[in-house]
């Protein structure tokens, strides 16, 4: 069950080194927002009835098996399970192999390599001509807001507020408690659990100017390492006999689930649940580590990776890129599983379609994604979608950080690339080898099916190489954007 809704004035959760200076200025800002809400109330009321609000919720490193509704008997996600029961659920859905690539694709509707993002920082600078999701909503008369993980997309020589967000509180690093929150030149030192603060910030935004449509992103940093949570969430897992590592991991997930529950309850308490499209996804698959230099114990990994998917975060095996997508719009979108194959690039075209916003309202490069609206409104619809092009972010076959300031010709055979389609997935492995997997019968990618489907293997191989060549020809990928990353020695 979602808890009762509650609003939290930001002044109760944010503190600064000089509160006597900061708090009055913020209070004035909040009052100004409330005053604006009364201006043109009749027009705003009409807009609110005809245009849905959009709430985008993104979790961090939450793999396909990290949910109760996908079949994990140990993890506790009652809120997300309920959201799934009320949503269209896409289980044949893929993101990129790591956070920055996924988020750049999410916010641009484009394949991440073409946006200039080819890894995590410092390989994650978006090109300045990329248009981001909130810009389309702002152009359509929406208020826009962001709270949470800072690497939505790194924006050299511009700020997030120049790219479509009216306001945004960006968590620096993985501070699960008492985070630093930059916002329009202010650096705020918040007090409390970050998951709760993200929820509070979004709720304050929702209530600040009633009657005008809004687009908000809640980007939680859970369950990204380090696993740090309130002990009341990890204690039940310890009592069940789970290891401290897994108890903290699942405790973090449970804490985020509770925060999302309060967020959804707040939307409902504001009377806006029926006119709000809620979209939920994770940015990539689960990490195979318990700490930066220590892998999760094999027994814990088996308990977490209950579907036995191959790989992990940063790889292009299924466990690195497959996550569920949830879309809820009460009374408009019927709940239930969708068989349609989708990819993260599809989210932007889809929500613009649902909101009735024109994509040509903002100058942008061509979307790689397509709208999933047909499948949302008719569960029987399964339309052909082009395979998703993906690249490993770390390990064998990944672009190396040192290439950033020492560019050299890129060879197809040096990388681990995949073409992931609705049923078939083609791997171009480093060293020139390849494999084809039939995910309909082999979702764990255990048996090369190229000999059974030689024509499909040949076709996907040629298409993958063609896309790679076309990408390099644009000059947009693998840009020289920063210094060499220092080598990190392993802890003894």
Spell out what each predicted region is:
Residues 27-38:
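Bacterial N-terminal signal peptides
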């Amino acid at each position: 069950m979602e808890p009762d809704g509650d609003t939290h004035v930001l002044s109760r959760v944010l503190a600064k080194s000089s509160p006597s200076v900061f708090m009055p200025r913020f209070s004035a800002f909040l009052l100004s927002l409330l005053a604006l809400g009364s201006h043109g109330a009749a027009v705003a009321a009409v807009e609110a009835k005809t245009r849905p609000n959009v709430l985008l919720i993104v979790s961090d490193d939450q793999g396909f098996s990290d949910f109760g509704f996908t079949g994990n008997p140990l993890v506790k996600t009652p809120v997300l399970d309920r959201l799934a029961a009320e949503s269209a659920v896409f289980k044949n859905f893929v993101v990129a192999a790591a956070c920055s690539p996924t988020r750049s694709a999410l916010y641009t509707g484009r394949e991440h390599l073409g946006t200039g993002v080819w890894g995590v920082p410092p390989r994650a600078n978006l090109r300045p001509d990329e248009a981001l999701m909130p810009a389309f909503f702002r152009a359509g008369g929406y208020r826009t807001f962001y709270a949470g993980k800072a690497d939505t997309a790194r924006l050299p020589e511009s700020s997030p507020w120049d790219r479509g967000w009216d306001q945004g509180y960006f968590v620096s690093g993985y501070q699960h408690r008492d985070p630093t929150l930059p916002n329009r030149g202010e650096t705020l030192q918040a007090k409390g659990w970050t998951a709760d603060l993200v929820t509070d910030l979004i709720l304050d935004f929702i209530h600040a100017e009633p009657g005008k449509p809004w687009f908000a992103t809640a980007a939680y940093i859970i369950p990204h390492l380090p696993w740090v949570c309130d002990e009341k969430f990890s204690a039940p897992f310890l009592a069940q006999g789970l290891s401290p590592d897994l108890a903290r991991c699942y405790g973090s997930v449970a804490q985020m689930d509770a925060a999302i529950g309060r967020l959804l309850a707040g939307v409902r308490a504001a009377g806006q649940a029926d006119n709000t499209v809620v979209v939920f996804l994770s940015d990539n698959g689960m990490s195979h580590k318990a700490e930066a230099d220590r892998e999760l114990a094999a027994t814990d990994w088996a308990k977490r990776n209950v579907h036995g998917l191959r790989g992990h975060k940063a790889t292009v095996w299924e466990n690195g890129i497959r996550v569920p997508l949830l879309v809820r719009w009460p009374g408009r979108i019927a709940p239930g599983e969708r068989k349609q194959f989708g990819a993260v690039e599809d989210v932007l075209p889809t929500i613009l379609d649902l909101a009735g916003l024109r994509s040509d309202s903002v100058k942008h490069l061509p979307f790689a994604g397509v709208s999933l609206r047909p499948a949302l409104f008719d569960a029987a619809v399964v339309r052909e979608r082009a395979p998703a092009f993906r690249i490993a972010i770390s390990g064998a076959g990944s672009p190396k950080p040192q290439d950033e300031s020492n560019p050299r010709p890129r060879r197809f055979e040096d990388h681990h690339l995949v073409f992931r389609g609705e049923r078939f997935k083609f791997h171009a492995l480093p060293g020139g080898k390849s494999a084809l997997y039939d995910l309909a019968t082999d979702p764990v990618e255990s048996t090369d099916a190229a000999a059974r489907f030689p024509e499909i293997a040949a076709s996907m191989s040629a298409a993958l190489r063609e896309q790679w060549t076309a990408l390099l020809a644009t000059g947009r990928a693998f840009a020289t954007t920063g210094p060499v990353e220092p080598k990190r020695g392993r802890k003894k």
